Amino acid sequence: LTKIKKLYYDGKKKALLISATGTGKTFLSAFAIKESNSRHILFIAHREQILLQAEKSYREILGKIDTGFLSGSEKNISADYVFATINMLAKDDIMRQFSPTHFEYIIIDETHRAGAKSYQKVISYFRPRFMLGMTATPERTDDFDIYKLFDNNIAYEIRLQEAMQENLLCPFHYFGIADIEVAGMIVDDNTHFSNLVSEQRVQHIIEQAGFYGYSGERLRGLVFCRTVDEAAELSHKFNERGFCTIALSGIDTQGSRNDAISRLEQPERQGGLDYIFSVDIFNEGVDIPAVNQIIMLRPTKSPIVFVQQLGRGLRKEKEKDYLVVLDFIGNYSNNFMIPIALFGDNSYNKDNMRRCISDGKNILYGPSTVNFDTIARKRIYEAIDKAHLNDVSLLKKAYEDLKNKLGKIPQINDFSYFGTIDIMRYWDKFGSYHAFLQKYEPNYNVALTGVQEEILQFICKRFARGKRIYEIELLQILLEGKEDIFTVLTAALAQQYHIGLPDTVKESVINNMTNVFTISNEREKYRHCVFIQQTDSKYVISDVFRACLKNKAFKNELIDVLAYARNNYQNNYYDTYAETDLCLYQKYTYEEVCWLLNWPHKINPNAMAGYFYEKNTRTIPVFINYIKADAKRVAYANKFLSDQRITAYSKLNRRIDSPDARHIYNADNENNRLFLFIRKPYEDKNTKEFYFLGDIHAIGRPVPAPRFNGFKIVYELMTPVREDIFDYLLS
């Protein structure tokens, strides 16, 4: 309210309020009007029912006010407070009965609809002193810029997850339930109508709804279906089984909808309703606080729609302690959107998505819970695995949403600051953010040379994820033009991060900064990526890099990349493990393991598979693809015996007396150090990242595995696997 008031008295003409369903947007707008001392008010919505609820709320806050409606049932243009449906107001003969300056204050509810011609017509005509737009979901699928419409003035923003933290909404218990097979076919995006309404499926839905129940004296539920016909037929079949339900669609009158809502809300079941079946007419703008159970029988096509439908039951009500949400999960291609919608994680990072599903109960704030049955969880994992999260259309959409919100081309740090898609998705797809902008942003006029683009992409690929700080800080020192660079680096590391620069690490940094670490087939591709050169007895900035930094645009882009890398390091990689540059439970590629263990050269991934002994550092990273045993490979599947022991197998064609076996079982005597890295093999097949689980040592000697033509060995982990990671790996 304070921010809206400030914008108003600062002379701003428009503002946008982004607030989750159920958090009191309408009440807030009434308080804002009261603060403004405005006399003539216009409240616009797309449905009459929203107007009726808004008018009631305004009377609660403002007392005895002169109100009237412009809708299909009433045409009052003389009231001080006019509540109008957009369809009625947009008619020329109605709108022009008001002068453009008649209303001092205009409220537009569900403002994400304002891209429509009817809204544009009304907004262009009126010239109020102040216009306030209200929505829970400003992002749109038609690329219309809602933020720009309101001059990019965001009065306040509180999304679903923040609203839950602030205890503004009713807690919910979400259950992801596997939809059943009908006639031997899993329900999916193309399931035939007859199977969607089959007796078998209806019985399954009823049984699950009864099992999970509701909070309150009686059941009051909303059921969201994929088609109008499905809603009607399911309602009919529920009624045949003793329920009192109705199906509503866009063809039903406002009076019919109001009557159905009243029957759902009434205290007595006699003459009331247990469920209302619909497709999308209750997605937004309708308050039914009494709803205590929501059933979702359609695929999650959009996180926005998911949150809208979930929000129908999140308004607090004294007769319910919580909302029950039942999501029947079929074999849908868009199942990967469920963790995005539920947890508000817009990073589009597959690992984050999987962790949300496996550890959802520990992620949501407060008493709300999320649970998936085994089959539903498996279907979501499969959808995540198949999802193309570097898809250009997805990246462009996420970019446009953020650009619209800011009213300018976003900088790299804006993506993390505003909690949108991870900037690394752009690096993975295009090599750099600059390359993406150059291709898809018409207002981006920055030009770099081929050498500068090569260097930028190398830094984004190798260092920008912030998995080690040494190279990041050294690049920053080079940018600042400082001399005696390793002396300056040593001081910076001690002062800012309280770490030293051991000789082994320094040598590794030099190898990285002179392109020695890179294997031969990549060396030509990044031949200009030499950042330092040796002059006499010390290292200085290379001639190539010095020349590149003369380009201000290149330098600024690099500053942004390094700022992101530094921030990511501090947030995710600062707490390193036992005299290494690795962090427990973070994920690393083969290349990153070579680099972070200070190996002189990168090793070909094919040679790394399984394990690899590096003689200079005496380190042996053990890489395990954790595959659940099946009938064909049960005898030779890697297997956790506990959270601190795992059975693993050697590479092919190895004997128990082979050198690699000796390096493993005789590690203590040889002063070798073994580390465990583990992944599920379906995870991001292109990157092949492994969770780091710390030091391990062999228990006893290897045992021959003749059918495998190798050996078996049991490892003990020095640190028991953290519970959520352990559960995820075994799930």
Task: Go through the PLM ranges and name each one.
Residues 113-173:
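Post-DEXD/H (motif II) to motif III coupling segment of the RecA-like Helicase ATP-binding lobe
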Residues 40-50, 194-241:
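Conserved strand-helix element at the start of the C-terminal RecA-like helicase core
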